[in-house]
Regions:
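Donor nucleotide-sugar binding/catalytic pocket of nucleotide-sugar-dependent glycosyltransferases
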Residues: 61-62, 140-190, 202
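Acidic anion/phosphate-binding donor-loop and adjacent secondary structure
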Residues: 70-74, 166-167, 172-174, 179-198, ...
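Glycosyltransferase donor-sugar binding loop
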Residues: 44-48, 203, 230-245
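Nucleotide-activated donor-binding/catalytic signature segment of Leloir-type glycosyltransferases, i.e.
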Residues: 235, 244-265
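Short hydrophobic beta-strand element within catalytic cores of glycosyltransferases
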Residues: 280, 301-304, 314
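Conserved donor-binding/catalytic core segment of Leloir-type glycosyltransferases
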Residues: 192-210, 215-219, 231-232
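A short, well-ordered alpha-helix in the C-terminal region of glycosyltransferases
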Residues: 330, 337, 344-359, 365-371
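Conserved acidic donor-binding segment of nucleotide-sugar-dependent glycosyltransferases
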Residues: 315-317, 321-328, 337-343
Length: 389
């Protein structure tokens, strides 16, 4: 007998590449689903977070997932593994989180009458900077065939990504804008400005696509001009990502005056306690950057690049300054202005917090995603989130 044959509450199965990613980016969403009466299951590669996940009451299904691998044997293996889980569990809803699970999970479900929610957390395949453009072209051809199925909807994290997916053939009436899981505004409260030297912070994985090299170059320009700025870099490399910064280069940053490489930080509030403003010079492919959301929740003004995702939360003249991609000079100028104007930082920081409270709290986003789950589970088949396009 399958697990699904003797269930009480409807089962929702999250398919995610890594356990840490689920905890960082989808935990509030899963907890909202549990509060709404769903039994939460998670299929993922388990690193060190099994106990934490199970303590939340979620059923865990370990996967032998090799994130980022394009080896056909690896792909066939993980598709078969997930398909077997679908057959055993018979979930009421499958929620594929991020591009690789969307593709792999959709392949695994071919021929199965599963209700599916496909969450696109940024569209790296649509970027001209993608290293392997053939992969991007193949995905653009494949995605409409995989995702335009009955009882299947998609979410994106910004309006630009909705337009891209619609342009390649996904049905626009089945694409909803949903900003990840939002941010916990109780845990991340507004912080007073720190005392001492003006400090800017970058928080995130150390990837080329995050624009960290541009940030280092901008800091060099400021140093040459005599601008005293302390730069914190919180985060580490991601060895499974082809754009990860080499360790030798990261080590070289530690030797530069005015730069502190903090590595992974367990409590992100510890970063924003030390920083006067947040920076993300992304090169594109973002959904809605969690680092900017968290900085804004803590009442920090923002400096970011003018790319989809960043400009959703970093709003020029309101709470942020936006600069062109790969432009160290423009970035240095924005950093210098933010560093020199305390009143501007105060106004922008207050606006950041207001934006998060009004639009991006995990409570608001949790209610919105439950509406989509209920629609897929036929609890409310015509429902859709009301406050986002």
């Amino acid at each position: 007998m399958t697990l699904g044959a003797s269930r009480g509450r409807p089962i929702i199965l999250y398919v995610v590449t890594e356990d840490w990613y689920f905890l960082q980016h989808r935990l509030p969403m899963a907890r909202a689903a549990a509060r709404a009466g769903y039994k939460v299951h998670l299929a993922t590669r388990v690193n060190k977070d099994r106990r934490t996940i199970e303590d939340f009451g979620f059923a865990l299904h370990p996967l032998n997932w090799r994130r980022g691998s394009l080896n056909p044997l690896d792909i066939v293996s993980i598709v078969a593994e997930i398909r077997q889980l679908y057959r055993l569990l018979q979930p009421d809803i499958v929620h594929h989180v991020a591009l690789q699970p969307v593709v792999i999970g959709s392949l695994a479900s071919i021929g199965m009458p599963l209700a599916q929610l496909n969450s696109f957390c940024g569209l790296g395949f649509a970027s001209p900077q993608l290293k392997t453009r053939m992969v991007g072209a193949a995905l653009k051809a494949l995605l409409p065939r995989l995702t335009n199925r009955p009882r299947t909807i998609a979410t994106v994290e910004n309006k630009d990504d909705k337009a891209v997916l619609s342009a390649i053939g996904l049905r626009p009436d089945r694409i909803f804008v949903l900003p990840g899981s939002g941010v916990d505004i109780q845990r991340l409260a507004p912080l007073a400005e720190p005392q001492g030297a003006i400090t800017a912070a970058f928080a995130g994985r150390l990837l080329v696509n995050k624009g960290v090299r541009t940030l280092i170059a901008a800091h060099d320009l400021l140093s040459k001009r005599g601008v005293q700025l302390r730069l914190l870099i919180a985060g580490g490399p991601d060895l499974a990502n082809p754009t990860s910064i080499p360790m030798a280069e990261i080590e070289s940053w530690k030797r530069r005056p005015g730069i502190t490489v903090m590595g992974h930080v367990s409590d992100i509030a510890d970063v924003w306690k030390l920083a006067h403003f947040g920076i993300l010079p992304s090169r594109g492919g973002e959904g809605l950057p969690m680092s900017l959301l968290e900085a804004a929740a803590c009442g920090r003004p923002l400096v970011a690049t003018d790319v989809p995702g960043c400009r959703e939360i970093a709003r020029p003249g309101i709470n942020a300054m936006l600069v062109p991609v790969d432009d160290p000079s423009a970035l240095a100028e924005a950093i210098s202005r933010m560093a020199s104007d305390r009143e501007l930082r105060r106004q922008f920081g207050q606006a950041s917090r207001r934006i998060v409270e009004a639009e991006y709290s995990s409570e608001i986003v949790g209610r919105e995603v439950v509406v989509l789950y209920d629609r897929l589970a036929d609890r409310h088949p015509d429902a859709s989130p009301e406050n986002r396009p």
